[in-house]
Amino acid sequence: MSNVIVVIGPGSIGQAIARRVSAGKHVLLAGLRQENTEAAAEVLSNAGFEVSTATVDVSSRESVHALVQTATALGDVTGVIHAAGVSPSQASPETILSVDLYGTALVLEEFGNVIAPGGAGVMIASQSGHGLGALTAEEDAALAMTPADELLGQPMLQPDQVRDSLHAYQLSKRGNALRVMAEAVRWGKRGARVNTISPGIIFTPMAKDELTGPGGEGYRRMIELCPAGRGGTPDEVATVGALLMGPDGGFITGSDFLMDGGLTAAYRFGELAP
């Protein structure tokens, strides 16, 4: 049977990581919009990768479970790259929580049941999760360990507690990192690893939406004043992804890798400090 790499959200970052880790393996690309998924599959296929596609709505357990069944029919799932999501300028708080928080919890739960020994997963979180103030120990535990289907019922995630789309995004991305830390224990019992990457401003179509949206001036200021003095590229995220999914990352699991050009540092100790 083939070794299968599942890529959920086959945009710039998902494709870049897949290129680094999928040679000689079967790539299953999954996304909400079939036309985008097929376009990404054509690019990878023309580059020599063995590719198939599927449609998935990560906010639906039934849809994610169907994707798991498709993947396991192809072979042993040795890698999961979850890069699907929506940004603050693209969706309401309710949609962001459903896709970015609940959706990631579903992917972790469902693929955690089938990941092959020696396998690895990378979930794309965000620097925004590091921009959220400290939560209580009880809130951390709720985000990390509440069963996925009960997660959106938590008091801290109700409409009267979530201020706006940015706040929903920050909570979701903080939750992603906490969730992966907890899920690493369960994945480890199968001999597998899982980590998050929290990128800063990476030049993807999603970032362009933010840069041209209502908060664009603030995003440009963040790029200018972060220590790196620039945004990042999907290939740079893929470098970290390849480490986490490969043998050199064999002792790394349950971790969150912040790669933001020093943006968080600038907010805490530099010119972006409040």
Report residues per predicted region:
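Hydrophobic structural elements of the Rossmann-like NAD(P)H-binding subdomain
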Residues: 81, 122-124, 194-197, 207, ...
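Rossmann-fold cofactor-recognition segment
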Residues: 44-62
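Conserved glycine-rich Rossmann-like NAD(P)H-binding loop of the short-chain dehydrogenase/reductase
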Residues: 24-39
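Catalytic loop of short-chain dehydrogenase/reductase
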Residues: 85-90, 117-190, 201-204
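C-terminal helical subdomain
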Residues: 106, 161, 169, 174-177, ...
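Short C-terminal tail/terminal secondary-structure segment
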Residues: 253-274
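Canonical Rossmann dinucleotide-binding motif of NAD(H)/NADP(H)-dependent dehydrogenases/reductases
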Residues: 1-28
